[in-house]
Every structure is written in structure tokens, then in C-alpha cells.
């Protein structure tokens, strides 16, 4: 049985629409958040080309992400490889604490901002209490990872090779992990394409939605 995992970054306003879409198909997902960048109300984040990207407000996070897995994406989304040790520790520990307090759930996962990491960053991620860390490195075999702090991905949600990589993972009965940012869904056609993918996967009798935490828990039990 193919396990399908999806991972979405940055806590932007389009996540509200995305979460509702996923609920309609009972699709599991992980959302990676930066608690230091959210304000009480929705706030401007940055410009992506001619598009303004806005972040969700703190007051709506619990409702938007109810039922989904939450992972840490650092406090303020810096390149962690450029930080001094004390700043690195703050980015990792303070963000995890804030997310756990707000969502009232353990935060086991991490996602490297900009995909940047090195041995010192990995060690700090582990020391801050995380059990896994997702990268943006594309790999053929996602799971089980050789190193849970260097968890690779299959592809982005918008990758032209999405279905060929899905089929390859399906043939092997492995794990297919796709990722992205919902602000990249800039048109009705892109939203329709994503929904078609979610619907197809949900209807596939040889596939099921999974979460990284659940997969790691199974692996830990088998290794015990």
C-alpha cells in the first residue's frame, strides 16, 4: 500500500482554502509554521513577483489547521546556517514552545527554512526536541530515511513529473511525499489541478493518506 504524505509551508492565508479542500477528501497533511511571524490578525508577509503574500492571524490558526499535523518551521524563517549558536537555539526552541502552547499538541517535526541545514543545524534541531526534519531534497526512496533529520521529498505538488514519480512510488509500495506553498496556487486552473490530484489519490485503492509522525511512530516500534 502506497503511503502518501503532503507538507505545506509558511502559514499563508491560502492555507485556509487548502485545508477546507483537503478536509473534503479526508486527506491528511502537515503544515509547517513560523510562530514569530504571525500577528493577531492577518498581516502582509512579502511579495512574490506581482503577488502579495499574506499570513494568517493567530486567532484563526487553530480553526484553520484543526485536525492536521503541525510542524515547526522556525520562529522567523531565517537561513539557519547563517545564525550564531544562541540565535539558532532561540529560533528552534522558542518556536516549538509557542506552537505547542497554542495548539496544545506535541510538535515532533521540523522543516528547514529555505531548505538550509548543516551538521550544526541538525544537532540543534534534535536538541530542541524534534524527531524529524524535512528538507527540499528530492530522493527516489523517501522512507525510511537514512537520517530522520534529512528527510527527503518526492517532488513539489506542481512538478510536471508528479504522476510519474507517484506511479514509481506506487509500484514499489513505498512513500510518496509532495510539498509546496499554497500561495503558489495563483489561478483557478492551478486549484482545479491540485484538487484533481487529491481526488485521484483519495480514490486510488492502492494508496492511503499518511502523516510523517505516524510513519515514524511505526518505524520506531519496528526498531524497538
Where are these regions (language model features)?
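A short acidic, amphipathic alpha-helical/loop segment
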Residues: 17-21, 120-124, 165, 193, ...
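Hydrophobic "anchor" residues on beta-strands that sit immediately upstream
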Residues: 5-6, 69, 207
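Boundary/entry segment of secreted carbohydrate-active catalytic domains
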Residues: 1-14
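Short beta->alpha connector loops
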Residues: 10-13, 113-117, 155-159
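Metal-dependent polysaccharide deacetylase catalytic core of the NodB/CE4 family, i.e.
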Residues: 25-121, 126-131, 139, 144-150, ...
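Glycan-processing catalytic domains of CAZymes
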Residues: 6-7, 72, 132, 144, ...
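Aromatic/hydrophobic pocket-lining residues that form the small-molecule binding cavity
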Residues: 15, 88, 92, 162, ...
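C-terminal domain-boundary segment and adjacent tail
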Residues: 24-26, 30, 40, 100, ...
Amino acid at each position: 500500500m502506497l503511503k502518501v504524505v503532503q507538507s505545506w509551508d509558511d502559514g499563508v492565508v491560502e492555507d485556509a482554502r487548502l485545508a477546507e479542500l483537503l478536509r473534503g477528501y479526508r486527506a491528511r497533511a502537515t503544515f509547517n509554521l513560523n510562530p514569530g511571524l504571525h500577528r493577531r490578525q492577518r498581516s502582509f508577509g512579502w511579495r512574490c513577483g506581482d503577488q502579495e503574500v499574506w499570513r494568517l492571524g493567530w486567532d484563526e490558526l487553530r480553526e484553520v489547521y484543526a485536525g492536521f499535523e503541525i510542524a515547526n518551521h522556525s520562529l522567523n524563517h531565517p537561513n539557519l546556517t547563517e545564525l550564531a549558536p544562541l540565535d539558532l537555539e532561540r529560533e528552534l526552541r522558542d518556536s516549538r514552545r509557542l506552537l505547542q502552547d497554542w495548539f496544545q499538541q506535541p510538535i515532533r517535526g521540523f522543516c528547514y527554512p529555505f531548505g538550509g541545514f548543516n551538521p550544526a543545524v541538525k544537532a540543534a534541531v534534535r536538541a530542541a526536541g524534534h524527531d524529524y526534519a524535512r528538507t527540499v531534497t528530492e530522493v527516489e526512496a523517501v522512507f525510511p530515511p537514512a537520517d530522520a533529520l534529512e528527510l527527503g521529498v518526492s517532488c513539489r505538488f506542481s512538478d510536471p513529473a508528479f504522476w510519474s514519480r507517484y506511479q514509481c512510488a506506487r509500484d514499489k509500495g513505498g512513500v510518496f511525499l509532495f510539498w509546496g506553498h499554497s500561495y503558489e496556487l495563483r489561478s483557478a486552473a492551478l486549484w482545479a489541478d491540485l484538487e484533481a490530484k487529491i481526488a485521484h489519490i483519495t480514490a486510488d485503492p492502492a494508496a492511503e493518506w499518511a502523516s510523517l509522525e505516524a510513519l515514524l511512530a511505526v518505524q520506531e516500534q519496528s526498531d524497538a
